[in-house]
Design a protein with these regions (language model features):
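Thiamine diphosphate
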Residues: 1-99, 111-112
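Residue-level marker of alpha-helix boundaries and capping positions
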Residues: 3-4, 49, 123, 148-151
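Iron-sulfur cluster-binding cysteine motifs and their immediate structural context
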Residues: 127-148, 159-174
């Protein structure tokens, strides 16, 4: 994540470039230090005391270290994510050193702001193919062979809707 990148990942990133590493590092930027209690980090623009400060750019640091291209994408936009991975693989095969930054606010912190609606299943369209279950979302289960979404757990990210081949899942706006 972004916090680990600032804490200890920059040195590893420098080593990848220095040693001509054949890999595509990804920084999962959720703008918080989730593993130790949701503190701010250098990518948030706030000090640990909550005062405004310089916001360090993950992308600018990666560029300064020698990565190119540096691709930024919303990880919940599956088409954009696939396009970024494809572009990064092509760049790597062309001798470049690509990297991907995925950016999406941490749901544990931004849940109320992010939750603008939940997904629901149109049972007439659902064919029980289980594509949505492969997403691994805890809100989705099967009842009578068809997908159902637990409204108390759904955060409205729409990843399930993006993978449904029958367009049986849609977002209900609040």
């Amino acid at each position: 994540g972004d916090s680990t990148f600032f804490h200890s990942g920059m040195t590893g990133a420098a080593e990848i470039v220095y040693n001509n590493g054949r890999m595509i590092p990804c920084v999962l930027d959720n703008r918080i230090t989730g593993m130790t209690g949701h503190q701010d980090n250098p990518g948030t623009g706030y000090t640990l005391q909550g005062d405004p400060t310089a916001l360090l750019s993950v992308e600018k640091i990666l560029t300064a270290l020698g990565f190119a291209p540096v691709l930024t994408v919303d990880p919940q936009d599956l088409k954009a994510m696939k396009a970024a991975v494809d572009q990064a693989v092509s760049a790597l095969n062309a001798g470049q050193q690509p990297t991907i930054v995925t950016r999406r606010p941490c749901l544990l912190i931004k849940r109320d702001k992010f939750r603008k609606g939940m997904c629901r299943v149109d049972t007439d369209k659902c064919r029980g193919c289980r594509s949505c279950l492969k997403v691994g979302c805890p809100a989705i289960s099967l009842e009578n062979g068809k997908a159902v979404i637990d409204r108390t757990q759904c955060v409205g990210c729409t990843v399930c809707a993006q993978v449904c081949p029958f367009d049986a899942i849609e977002k209900e706006e609040k």
